[in-house]
Design a protein with these regions (language model features):
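Detector for C-terminal structural segments
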Residues: 27, 33-35, 48, 54-55, ...
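Surface-exposed binding/hinge segments that line
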Residues: 98, 135-183, 207
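Structural transition elements
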Residues: 203, 292, 324-357, 374-384
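N-terminal lobe/hinge region of extracytoplasmic solute-binding protein
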Residues: 33-90, 198
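Aromatic- and charge-enriched surface segment that lines or borders ligand/interaction sites
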Residues: 84-129, 158, 295-297
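A bilobed periplasmic-binding-protein/Venus flytrap-type ligand-binding module shared by bacterial periplasmic
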Residues: 66-67, 217-221, 280-304, 504
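Gly/Pro-rich hinge or "lid" segments in bacterial periplasmic/extracellular proteins
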Residues: 67-72, 173-229, 235, 241, ...
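Ligand-site clamp/hinge motif
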Residues: 188-191, 221-267, 398
């Protein structure tokens, strides 16, 4: 698999070098992604957070968006296509979203409350003519709170949740708005829309070639004039293999690469390239299966695995481009709380716990883990997982890997540990977006969000944890909600619910010609301020 991806990466780099449309031009920025293919262009992207970064929040908008203007503070949600939202004081399941007037899709049609309803239908209503299984697979699990919705007037939408849920605005931030009129124009075919998409975002997608490139140009009529792009063109190219990305940057075939290989950072700096990093809400974990027969059902085994990891050694492997995990959340996070289990490197304590669980030199724990060779937020999964594998072997846990492409891993994650696609694996290396209560905590472990209802891949179920999740959803006071979130994180750590290894620093390498980029503490980024010398 890794060899095939390398061949595809080198082919993409060759196509990039020979393509006349990608020739250097004034104001053209070319970015090498870690994804192995161009993300879906129809609104709800695939390829994880990277898909949303490059083909979601560029060409599309949501009702609620993230403030990406600052590198110095964590992002917060801000008005997008909705100017305001509020929960009904008498009925905490009823939300009203007031929409921004005068917004148009790229095809010139109006954005209205009917557009919002139409887009929710494309994800949630299998009987709707515009229902798209591919987009639904990406978006449905993002909005599990939604029970119903309606247009109240052209600029007002009402959304009703299944139960009171204070996390709804964070869920809605994932839902991109595609043009209903464009879908009609394209013969009611999402395949046709993919080639000629229409959103309301600051960028317009003008070219799309699978596994080769996507091109975007500014939307001069964008509703937020401060975010009208300054570039002439933005081009994204899939280059999943780190050495191919680095080679493309050094040769001038791209101007910017995501996630440079750590062992190239010093030489890239000495060659005049910029290395940009920042903390962001990310973790690099193994999500552990809790189905019957999984060795991870024993807390002693989970704690032993966490104590086996030499996180400082991994930091050295990555040339310092990581933050060693002290929990599921990064150190200093406002929801960190005071967990009592410390994620230190203590192989002897790990061996003792494994012995208590019935394992030893004559009876090693043997298991299989799903991993990918690349992918959004996955950092450098092959050498990192091999490092973890070695650490675990030293205490008596023998791990074999099933290597699958990133998008395939996402599909396995959505299918769940009980599905045949998991191939008997008891865990998967999966990185998580942890910048809000729902995507950071609830979706991973709530009982009723096990597949196919949601993305609780491991089928974990604990009524005590569910009670805490319910408290978060029903608590609309931020200070009170924070106390509950701290308790949740303490439980995540003290019960070692994941193998918690590291947090990324979101490294990017770019040409000195790239100016004006502000790296937000977020999975998503604003490219509108960027210029090229």
């Amino acid at each position: 698999m890794a060899l095939r991806l390398l061949q595809k990466s080198l082919l993409a780099a060759a196509l990039l070098a020979g393509s006349s449309v990608l020739a250097l031009a004034g104001g053209t920025l070319r970015i090498g992604m870690t994804a192995s293919d161009i993300p879906l262009t129809t609104g709800q992207t695939d390829n994880g957070g990277e898909g949303m970064r490059f083909l979601g929040y560029t060409a599309y908008d949501s009702l609620v968006e993230w403030d990406l203007s600052s590198a110095d503070k964590p992002s917060t949600i801000v008005p997008g296509l909705a100017t305001s939202w509020a929960v009904d004081a008498a009925d905490k399941t009823k939300w009203t979203f007031k929409l921004r007037p005068g917004v148009k899709f790229h095809d010139g049609s109006d954005f209205t409350a009917d557009s919002v309803v139409w887009n929710l239908e494309k994800l949630l209503n299998k009987d709707a003519p515009q229902f798209d299984p591919r987009q639904s697979a990406q978006g449905r699990s993002r909005i599990p709170a939604v029970a119903s919705y309606k247009a109240v007037d052209p600029l007002t939408v009402e959304i009703v949740t299944k139960t009171p849920d204070a996390t709804l605005p964070y869920q809605i931030a994932w839902i991109m708005m595609s043009s209903p009129a464009n879908w009609e124009k394209q013969g009611k075919s999402w395949d046709a829309v993919a080639k000629s998409p229409s959103g309301t975002g600051p960028w317009k997608i003008t070219a799309f070639v699978p596994r080769e490139k996507a091109e975007m140009v500014p939307n001069p009529d964008y509703w937020d004039k401060a975010r009208v792009p300054k570039l002439d063109k933005l081009v994204v190219v899939p280059l999943p293999e780190p050495s191919a990305r680095t080679a493309a940057l050094r040769s001038g075939q791209v101007d910017w690469i995501e996630n440079p290989a750590p062992d190239t950072v010093a030489s890239l700096k000495s060659a005049g390239f910029k290395i940009v990093t920042n903390a962001y809400p990310h973790n690099w974990t193994w999500h552990l299966s809790r189905v019957d027969g999984s060795p991870w059902n024993d807390v002693r085994v989970r704690k032993a695995a966490n104590l086996a990891i030499d996180r400082e050694g991994m930091k050295e492997l990555l040339s310092g481009l990581m933050i060693p995990a002290e929990g599921f959340l990064p150190p200093g996070h406002q929801w960190f709380g005071r967990p009592t289990f410390k994620l230190k490197h203590d192989p002897e304590a790990a061996k003792k716990l494994l012995a208590e669980a019935g394992y030893g030199p004559n009876k090693p724990l043997e298991t299989k883990i799903l991993i990918s060779p690349s992918g959004s937020g996955q950092m450098l999964p092959l050498p990192m997982n091999e490092f973890v594998q070695q650490n675990l072997a030293e205490v008596g846990i023998k791990v074999s890997f099933e290597v699958v492409e990133w998008n395939t891993l996402i599909n396995i994650w959505r299918a769940g540990a009980k599905h045949e696609s998991s191939k008997g694996a008891t865990g998967m290396n999966y990185t998580y977006f942890i910048q809000d209560p729902f995507t950071g905590f609830i979706r991973h472990l709530q009982c009723n969000l096990a597949p196919p209802a949601g993305t609780n891949w491991g089928f974990y179920c604990d009524p005590e944890m569910d009670k805490l999740f319910d408290e978060v959803r029903s608590t609309f006071d931020p200070a009170a909600q924070q106390k509950t979130l701290e308790k949740i994180h303490e439980k995540y750590v003290d019960e070692a619910l994941f193998l918690m290894v590291t947090h990324d620093v979101n490294a990017r390498a770019m040409s000195p010609k790239v100016k004006g980029f502000v790296q937000a503490q977020n999975w998503f980024q604003n490219f509108s301020s960027v210029t090229m010398d």
